[in-house]
C-alpha cells in the first residue's frame, strides 16, 4: 500500500453491500474519500450464488464510491463471513534440549502448522493465521520467547480457512468488474478490530454478530482470534417460524418479531389485555385469536436453539471460565427489544448490546453501517500484532511484530 494511493474495501452482505475508499499518508494517517451502500444481489451468507447478479451489484456499489471519490480502483479488499469458514487450532511442539530458543525454532513450528492445515483442508485456502500463545517448559508466554533457555517449545495458533472455490467465485465477480481482490478479511475479526478495545481483546471477549440469515461468533484472547464459527441461522428464521406456525404473512411476522419483548415480561405493545395478539398486526391476514404464549414460545424456541449452539462453542474453548470475559452482541439482530437481557440470563454473563455499551463508555467508534469496513481499514493500515499478514508492503513491515514478519501467507 503506497502512501496517498486510493484503496478500497467492500463488505459483501446478504441485504446490502458497503464500500469505502480511503488513502493513507506518509504519517500513517487515513482519510475516508467516500462511502457507498447498495442492494446486495447474487450473494448469500458471503457466498456467490449468482455470478451475473453479484458482479452487477458489486460494480454498482464500487462505482458509486469511485464516482464520489473521483478515483478508479484497481484492487479492493473483501470483508465477508461464511458458514463454510473453518477455524482450526494447532499446537506444535519442538525439542530445544536446554538450548536457547531461536527465530528458526518458531519459524519451523509455523511452517509445520501451515503444512498440516493445507493437508487437512486441501480444498480450503488460509485467509488468517493468529498466534495464540507460546508454551515454554509448561509455562505460557504471550510474546515470542526468543533467547530463552528451554527443553521444549510449544506454539498455539489459530487458522481461519475458506473453500478455494468460494474464493475463485469472489475473484471472478470482481474480475468481471475489472478489479482484483487485494485480500479477504473475516468480518467478525474486522468488527472486533474496530469496536473492541485492546484490553478487551487481551483479557478475553466474545463477539456475537447477529444477522438476518446468519450469526457469527468470534472469541478473542491475547489479542488473537482463538475461535470463530458462523451459523446459517439468523433473526429471519424467527420471522419464518412465526409465519409458518401462526399462518401469517412474512411482513406481518417480521413486524411482530420486531415488537417482541425478549425479556418475556408483559408486552402491552403487542398483546391486548386478554393476552392475544392485537388486531392492528393483522394487515394482510384475517384476524383471529393468537395467544401471547404461542408467539413468545415460538421466538424463545428459536433463540434458545441459536444460543445453545453458541454456548457450546464458547464452552469448548474454555473462555467462558475466564474471569473478566466480556460478551457483546452486535448486528441487526442485536436491536431486538431487550435481547441482551435474555442473553445475559441464558449465558450467566452480563451481555452488552454494543451500541448501548459504546454510549456508556462515551465511545464514538461504533458506526453500524461501516463498522466492519473501518475495522478492515485498521487491520490493513496498521497490521495486527498476532496475525501473519498476507503479503505485507514495505511500509507495513516496520510496524509488524516478529510473528508476522517471519511468516508470509499467500492466498
Language-model features: locations:
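Nucleotide/phosphate-binding catalytic cleft detector across ATP-hydrolyzing
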Residues: 1-16, 20-75, 79-206, 224-226, ...
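A short acidic Gly-Thr/Ser loop motif
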Residues: 10-16, 81-82, 207-214, 220-223, ...
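Acidic-glycine-rich active-site phosphate/pyrophosphate-binding loop
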Residues: 31, 211-213, 342-359
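Feature representing long, continuous alpha-helical segments
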Residues: 240, 297, 301-308, 312, ...
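Hydrophobic alpha-helical bundle architecture
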Residues: 313-321, 325-332, 352-358
Amino acid at each position: 500500500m503506497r502512501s496517498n494511493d486510493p484503496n478500497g474495501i467492500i463488505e459483501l452482505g446478504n441485504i446490502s453491500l458497503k464500500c469505502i475508499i480511503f488513502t493513507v499518508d506518509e504519517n500513517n494517517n487515513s482519510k475516508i474519500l467516500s462511502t457507498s451502500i447498495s442492494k446486495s444481489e447474487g450473494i448469500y451468507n458471503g457466498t456467490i450464488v449468482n455470478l451475473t447478479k453479484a458482479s452487477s451489484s458489486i460494480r454498482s456499489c464500487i462505482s458509486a464510491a469511485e464516482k464520489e471519490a473521483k478515483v478508479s480502483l484497481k484492487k479492493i479488499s473483501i470483508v465477508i463471513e461464511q458458514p463454510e469458514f473453518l477455524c482450526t487450532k494447532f499446537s506444535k511442539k519442538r525439542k530445544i534440549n536446554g538450548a536457547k530458543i531461536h527465530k528458526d525454532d518458531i519459524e519451523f513450528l509455523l511452517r509445520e502448522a501451515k503444512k498440516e492445515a493445507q493437508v487437512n483442508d486441501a480444498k480450503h485456502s488460509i485467509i488468517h493465521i493468529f498466534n495464540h500463545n507460546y508454551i515454554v517448559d509448561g509455562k505460557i508466554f504471550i510474546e515470542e520467547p526468543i533467547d530463552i533457555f528451554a527443553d521444549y517449545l510449544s506454539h498455539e495458533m489459530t487458522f481461519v480457512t475458506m473453500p478455494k472455490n468460494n474464493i475463485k467465485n469472489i475473484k471472478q465477480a470482481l474480475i468481471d468488474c475489472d478489479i482484483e481482490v487485494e485480500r479477504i478479511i473475516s468480518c467478525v475479526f474486522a468488527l472486533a478490530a474496530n469496536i473492541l478495545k485492546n484490553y478487551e481483546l487481551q483479557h478475553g471477549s466474545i463477539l456475537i454478530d447477529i444477522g438476518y440469515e446468519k450469526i457469527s461468533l468470534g472469541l478473542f484472547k491475547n489479542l488473537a482470534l482463538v475461535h470463530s464459527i458462523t451459523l446459517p441461522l439468523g433473526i429471519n428464521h424467527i420471522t419464518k417460524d412465526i409465519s409458518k406456525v401462526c399462518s401469517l404473512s412474512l411482513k406481518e411476522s417480521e413486524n411482530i418479531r420486531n415488537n417482541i419483548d425478549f425479556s418475556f415480561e408483559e408486552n402491552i405493545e403487542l398483546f391486548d389485555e386478554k393476552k392475544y395478539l392485537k388486531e392492528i398486526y393483522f394487515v394482510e391476514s384475517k384476524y383471529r385469536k393468537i395467544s401471547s404464549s404461542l408467539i413468545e414460545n415460538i421466538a424463545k424456541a428459536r433463540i434458545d436453539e441459536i444460543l445453545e449452539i453458541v454456548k457450546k462453542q464458547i464452552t469448548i474453548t474454555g473462555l467462558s471460565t475466564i474471569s473478566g470475559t466480556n460478551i457483546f452482541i452486535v448486528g441487526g439482530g442485536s436491536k431486538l427489544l431487550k435481547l441482551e437481557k435474555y442473553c445475559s440470563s441464558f449465558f450467566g454473563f452480563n451481555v452488552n448490546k454494543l451500541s448501548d455499551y459504546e454510549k456508556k463508555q462515551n465511545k464514538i467508534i461504533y458506526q453500524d453501517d461501516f463498522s466492519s469496513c473501518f475495522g478492515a481499514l485498521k487491520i490493513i493500515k496498521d497490521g495486527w500484532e498476532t496475525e501473519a499478514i498476507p503479503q505485507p508492503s514495505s511500509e507495513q513491515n516496520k510496524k509488524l511484530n516478529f510473528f508476522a514478519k517471519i511468516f508470509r501467507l499467500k492466498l
